C-alpha cells in the first residue's frame, strides 16, 4: 500500500496528464464561447444594411501653382510703330528684325516708306549703334528698290 500512495503522488507510468482537476476544461469552454461570439458579431455586421454615407468633407489641397511663361510681345506692325497707318501705298514686304536678345520686330513696308525713317524706328526700339542703323537703312533701301522693280 505504501507503494500505491507513492504512485499517486508521482506521475503515472503511462505519461498521461491528470485531467481530473477540470482546469483545461474551463480554458476549452472559454475558447468555444469566444469563437461563437466572434461568429455572431461577423454575421451581424454582414446583415447590417450597407448604405452610402458621405464622410466628412476633407479640405482639398490647394491647386498647385503652375508657371505660365509670359507671352512674347506680339509682332510690331507699322500701325503700332507709326503715328498713322500708311493706307495709300501698296504693301511691298514685311520686315522682321531680330535683335541680339532674340526679340523680333516686324514692320510692314509700303512702297512710299522712307528707308531712313524705318531704320531709325527700328534702331531706337532695339538700341542699335550708328553703323548698324546705316547698314539696316541700306538693306531696307535695297529691298524696297528691288520690289519696286518687280511690280
From Swiss-Prot:
Residues 32-46, 70-85 have a biased composition (Basic and acidic residues). Transmembrane segments: none annotated. It comes from the Eukaryota. Residues 1-89 are annotated as: Disordered. This is UPF0561 protein C2orf68 homolog. Belongs to the UPF0561 family. InterPro entries: UPF0561.
Amino acid at each position: 500500500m505504501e507503494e500505491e500512495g507513492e504512485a499517486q503522488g508521482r506521475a503515472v507510468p503511462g505519461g498521461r496528464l491528470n485531467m481530473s482537476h477540470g482546469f483545461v476544461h474551463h480554458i476549452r469552454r472559454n475558447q468555444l464561447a469566444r469563437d461563437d461570439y466572434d461568429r455572431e458579431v461577423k454575421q451581424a455586421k454582414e446583415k447590417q444594411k450597407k448604405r452610402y454615407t458621405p464622410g466628412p468633407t476633407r479640405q482639398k489641397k490647394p491647386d498647385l501653382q503652375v508657371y505660365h511663361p509670359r507671352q512674347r510681345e506680339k509682332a510690331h506692325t507699322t500701325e503700332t510703330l507709326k503715328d498713322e497707318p500708311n493706307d495709300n501705298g501698296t504693301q511691298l514686304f514685311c520686315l522682321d528684325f531680330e535683335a541680339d536678345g532674340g526679340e523680333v520686330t516686324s514692320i510692314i513696308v509700303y512702297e512710299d516708306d522712307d528707308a531712313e525713317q524705318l531704320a531709325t524706328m527700328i534702331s531706337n526700339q532695339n538700341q542699335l549703334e550708328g553703323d548698324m542703323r546705316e547698314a539696316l537703312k541700306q538693306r531696307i533701301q535695297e529691298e524696297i528698290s528691288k520690289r519696286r522693280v518687280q511690280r
